């Protein structure tokens, strides 16, 4: 009985060594990261950014839908109002140490202000450095939707003008004409 157990043990060890040596000469899966580009899937969800509309204004209207949609509660913002009546976030903060990059904030945003980019290099030495303020998140361009302007598309009144009378604004849609 003991000899059979010893033979099984030696056989198991030899089989393990054989598997290790067979993998030693197989092609490597490891990439030398900075020198070799890492493949990211086309729909990869990475760093979150805040975009601007084509006119250069912030797209975010501080509706708070992104913060409500976030399952971990890593988004916080405070609404404020400009002189012309347009809302904007007084502060907009995302804690990336809690963010799970699910993309629900991007889906909830009616103005396409929040967009997820394929950037994945977010390593920091201190946890406090992963809390991004509005200035850190705001980019200079429109992101994925270069022609979209929420105020132009929504038909909201701008500066006290009736809907459809502002420059470059589409005429309001008659909802009753859409009925079958």
Curated annotation (Swiss-Prot):
Primary localization: membrane
Domain of life: Bacteria
Gene Ontology CC terms, in alphabetical order: plasma membrane
Pfam families per the UniProt record, alphabetical: Fer4_7
Tagged with keyword Protein biosynthesis: no
Boundaries of every 4Fe-4S ferredoxin-type domain copy: 48-80, 90-119
Enzyme nomenclature, EC number: 7.1.1.-
Catalytic activity: a quinone + NADH + 5 H(+)(in) = a quinol + NAD(+) + 4 H(+)(out)
Topology of this chain in the membrane: Peripheral membrane protein
Binding site residues for [4Fe-4S] cluster 1: 60, 63, 66, 109
Residue positions binding [4Fe-4S] cluster 2: 70, 99, 102, 105
Cofactor(s) of this protein: [4Fe-4S] cluster
Annotated keywords: 4Fe-4S, Cell inner membrane, Cell membrane, Iron, Iron-sulfur, Membrane, Metal-binding, NAD, Quinone, Repeat, Translocase, Ubiquinone
Span list, region Disordered: 161-180
Signal peptide positions on this chain: none
Comment on bound cofactor: Binds 2 [4Fe-4S] clusters per subunit.
Gene Ontology molecular function: 4 iron, 4 sulfur cluster binding; iron ion binding; NADH:ubiquinone reductase (non-electrogenic) activity; quinone binding
Record's compositionally biased regions (Basic and acidic residues): 161-174
Gene Ontology biological process terms in this record: aerobic respiration
UniProt subcellular location: Cell inner membrane
Family from the record: Belongs to the complex I 23 kDa subunit family.
Stated role: NDH-1 shuttles electrons from NADH, via FMN and iron-sulfur (Fe-S) centers, to quinones in the respiratory chain. The immediate electron acceptor for the enzyme in this species is believed to be ubiquinone. Couples the redox reaction to proton translocation (for every two electrons transferred, four hydrogen ions are translocated across the cytoplasmic membrane), and thus conserves the redox energy in a proton gradient.
Subunit structure as annotated in this protein's UniProt entry: NDH-1 is composed of 14 different subunits. Subunits NuoA, H, J, K, L, M, N constitute the membrane sector of the complex.
Protein name: NADH-quinone oxidoreductase subunit I
Organism: Aeromonas hydrophila subsp. hydrophila (strain ATCC 7966 / DSM 30187 / BCRC 13018 / CCUG 14551 / JCM 1027 / KCTC 2358 / NCIMB 9240 / NCTC 8049)
Lineage, broadest ranks: Bacteria, Pseudomonadati, Pseudomonadota, Gammaproteobacteria, Aeromonadales
């Amino acid at each position: 009985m003991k000899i059979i157990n010893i033979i099984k043990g030696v056989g198991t060890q030899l089989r393990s060594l054989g598997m290790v040596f067979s993998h030693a000469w197989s092609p490597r899966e490891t990439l030398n990261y900075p020198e070799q580009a890492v493949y990211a899937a086309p729909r990869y969800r990475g760093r979150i950014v805040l975009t601007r509309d084509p006119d250069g204004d912030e797209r975010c209207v501080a509706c708070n839908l992104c913060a409500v949609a976030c399952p971990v509660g890593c988004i916080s913002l405070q609404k404020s109002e400009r002189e012309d009546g347009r809302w904007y976030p007084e502060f907009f903060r995302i804690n990336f140490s809690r963010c799970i990059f699910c993309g629900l904030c991007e889906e909830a945003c009616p103005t396409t202000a929040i967009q997820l980019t394929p950037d994945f290099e977010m390593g920091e030495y201190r946890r406090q450095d992963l809390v991004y303020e509005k200035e850190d998140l705001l980019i200079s361009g429109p992101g994925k939707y270069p022609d979209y302007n929420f105020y132009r598309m929504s038909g909201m009144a701008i500066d006290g003008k009736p809907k459809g009378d502002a420059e470059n604004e589409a005429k309001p849609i008659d909802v009753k004409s859409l009925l079958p």
